[in-house]
Amino acid sequence: MVDIDEFAVHTAQYRRELLAHCYRMVGSVDDAEDLVQETMLRAWRAYGDFEGRASMRTWLYRIATNACLNALQHSSRRVLPSGLSGPSDDPETAPFLSNEIPWLQPMPDVRIEPESSDPAAIVAAREGMRLALIAVWQYLPPRQRAVLILRDVLRWKASEVAELLEVSVTAVNSTLQRAHATLRQLPLATADIAEPDDPAVRAVLDRYAAAFENADMAALTELLKTDAVMEMPPIREWFRGNLRIVRLIATRCPTRAGEVQMVRTAANGQPAFGFYVRGEAHSIHVLTATPTGIERIVSFHDSGLFEGFDLPKSLL
């Protein structure tokens, strides 16, 4: 009989990084949580046969990766609006909601960052979590995705990946080359990435929050990069250009100061805000922010996400 306390002691420390791994694979926080639960259940059932020939961490990653690969056989690719069509040039048209599409979800940093305050550990946890990376990886076939994440993000040796996937080292290297070739053909949003705690970035974020809270469209226009992008899943349309984005916001958002409140949080290793309208949860804004302005806004219009960020549904 396996001792449940012993099992918990040996596996609990890996839960957060396994959640990050499963999320990178499937692009959904909800599905990643389910897959971590499945991983732990499978590990519990097989724990009595674990001989320690591989480390506990490697063993759990093998179980988690195989669980993800099995799940991806029966699921559709997670996407952002920019992965479906070109940008819209009409920000004043009524939005087209597409709740049937499996949208990419944001990962709250609080769910995956290590409980220790070690800066190096926190930076390592953020690696490979950028929303743009997660979105583009979803274009890869599942096994290419797994190899790329294990090799390029987690820095596993080719021999370790080969053992996990039960293939040859040659097959791993070939799969990684095909993944890189596929990614080179895909557009990847890039910016001068800065840490969210950079003082210049913090100042940009303060101005962003103030612009919404004060309904200051002029300030927002100045803050957004000229070619900034805004996406709003589950709305299919997305917009490029600061002037179009501000027209969109002026058309669809409250226009009186004090009607919007912004609460700082973080997602995918990026700065984010809980966006409240008249005190009620509305959306999560995940930002690509640079010291000189906002490059991209992904506004997830789903108040159900707030709980995962430890944010209240209401500020009233």
Q: Would you name each region that the model predicts?
A:
Residues A158-L164, V169-T255, E259-Q261:
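Solvent-exposed, charged amphipathic helical/linker segments at domain boundaries
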